[in-house]
């Protein structure tokens, strides 16, 4: 119905989505929630969305005659120190006759409403699908078989087989990702190390310039894939993804610092240069299959050789000494330094051990709490924002003080 170039997000296969039984689901306490995840504007004040195809999300459980509805704009605000701050709008899909604009007939003009319909839909009919209770049902992933919204909009990747646990995992990921992403350099580095770290920083900057960004849902999917295909997302600990670190058996790489920082530890990036590719692991390893009660176990034995004349040989040896069977230990330069002792000069008025008279401390004004800011929201905005997840601003990843090899990762 609407025109415009899609943003390249029409992935297949189309999921079969079941939206309730003969009666529409009851509406939850947080308001009229959409069955589907939102599309989000990439910046403020963009025009209303246009779609390459019909604009109706894929849903094989709905009759073709009822494949019509509307996208509704929902303003979003993020609490801040100086008051609430607007963030790009979100648009939610509702079937005709449901949701906040349930009293409108298809095609009636109203600000913030975009009507869409699939080919062959009876726009005079009204849907009996109701709306979603967020306390009982997760949002369904968006899929568009005939083309999605234009390039001013995006939506987060949600796996089709996501369970109810995805919400709490995403929340814990968001909390851990708020940790400071930069640390001061410790100690002095050699010229070669400085050059390597500069190259590592350039790699990350180039990736960030290209717009590489991992959403909360994508990070959760990365951490909960099949074990052999998992990768550690930003903000995750090693043991959150691959289990506790051990000694003398599988899972024995990583000291306590690496376990806590995950990929933020620069030694991870350096060591990945020594890890075989999938093809190298398959065709260059000694493969040993073994049938076990729980299934087929495949063991891959691969040897990576770092020549002694390699410029980073000493750095790789140091990383292995620290991280192989490193559970319970930390790098020496990461341990807290003892406070320097005062010089043993005779006491004078200037350095007398007698305590100085302290000035009274000024009382700090209490910061404005988020709940006070939330009081400035209208009831309609509170209802709208109840089903929204604010996007975290991309963090600059610190790759640490260790070596990086010649190959870009």
From Swiss-Prot:
Main location: virion
Pfam family, one: CoV_nucleocap
PTM-bearing positions, type Phosphothreonine: 378
Domain CoV N CTD: 215-331
Modification Phosphoserine occurs at: 190, 379
Polar residues bias: start-end ranges: 57-68
Region (Dimerization), start-end ranges: 226-333
Domain CoV N NTD: 31-156
CDD domains listed in its UniProt record: CoV_N-CTD, CoV_N-NTD
Compartments reported by the entry: Virion; Host endoplasmic reticulum-Golgi intermediate compartment; Host Golgi apparatus
Biased composition (Basic residues): 70-84, 358-367
Cystine residue pairs: 320-323
RNA-binding as annotated region, ranges: 29-160
GO terms of molecular function: RNA binding
Function: Packages the positive strand viral genome RNA into a helical ribonucleocapsid (RNP) and plays a fundamental role during virion assembly through its interactions with the viral genome and membrane protein M. Plays an important role in enhancing the efficiency of subgenomic viral RNA transcription as well as viral replication.
Subunit details: Homooligomer. Both monomeric and oligomeric forms interact with RNA. Interacts with protein M. Interacts with NSP3; this interaction serves to tether the genome to the newly translated replicase-transcriptase complex at a very early stage of infection.
Family: Belongs to the gammacoronavirus nucleocapsid protein family.
Stated name of the protein: Nucleoprotein
């Amino acid at each position: 119905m609407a025109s415009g170039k899609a943003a390249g997000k029409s992935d297949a296969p189309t999921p079969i989505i079941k939206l309730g039984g003969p009666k529409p689901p009851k509406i939850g306490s947080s308001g009229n929630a959409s069955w589907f995840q939102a599309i989000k504007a990439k910046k403020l004040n963009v025009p209303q969305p246009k779609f390459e195809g019909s604009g109706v999300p894929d849903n094989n459980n709905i009759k073709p005659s009822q494949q019509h509805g509307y996208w509704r704009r929902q303003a979003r605000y993020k609490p801040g120190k100086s008051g609430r701050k607007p963030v790009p709008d979100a648009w939610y899909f509702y079937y005709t006759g449901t949701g906040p604009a349930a009293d409108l007939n298809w095609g009636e003009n109203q600000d913030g409403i975009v009507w869409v319909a699939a080919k062959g839909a009876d726009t005079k009919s009204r849907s009996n699908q109701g709306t979603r209770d967020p306390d009982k049902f997760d949002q369904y992933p968006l899929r568009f078989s005939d083309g999605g919204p234009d390039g001013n909009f995006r939506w987060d990747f949600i796996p089709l087989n996501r369970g109810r646990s995805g919400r709490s995992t995403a929340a814990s990921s968001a909390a851990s990702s708020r940790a400071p992403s930069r640390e001061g350099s410790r100690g002095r580095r050699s010229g070669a190390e400085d050059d390597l770290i500069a190259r590592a920083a350039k790699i990350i900057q180039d990736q960030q310039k290209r717009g590489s960004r991992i959403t909360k849902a994508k990070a959760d999917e990365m951490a909960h894939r099949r074990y052999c295909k998992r990768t550690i997302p930003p903000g995750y600990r090693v043991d959150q993804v691959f289990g506790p670190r051990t000694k003398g058996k599988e899972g024995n790489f990583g000291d306590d610092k690496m376990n806590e920082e995950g990929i933020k530890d620069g030694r991870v990036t350096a060591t990945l240069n020594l890890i075989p590719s999938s093809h190298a692991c398959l065709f260059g390893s000694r493969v040993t299959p073994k049938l076990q009660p729980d299934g087929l176990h495949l063991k891959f034995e691969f040897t990576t050789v770092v020549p002694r004349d390699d410029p980073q040989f000493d750095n790789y040896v140091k990383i292995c000494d620290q991280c192989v069977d490193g559970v319970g230990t930390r790098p020496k330069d990461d341990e807290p330094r003892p406070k320097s002792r005062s010089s043993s000069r005779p006491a004078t008025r200037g350095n007398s051990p007698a305590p100085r008279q302290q000035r009274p401390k000024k009382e700090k004004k209490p910061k404005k709490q988020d709940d006070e800011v939330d009081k400035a929201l209208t009831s309609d905005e509170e209802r709208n924002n109840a089903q929204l997840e604010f996007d975290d601003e991309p963090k600059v990843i610190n790759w640490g003080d260790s070596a990086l090899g010649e190959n870009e990762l």
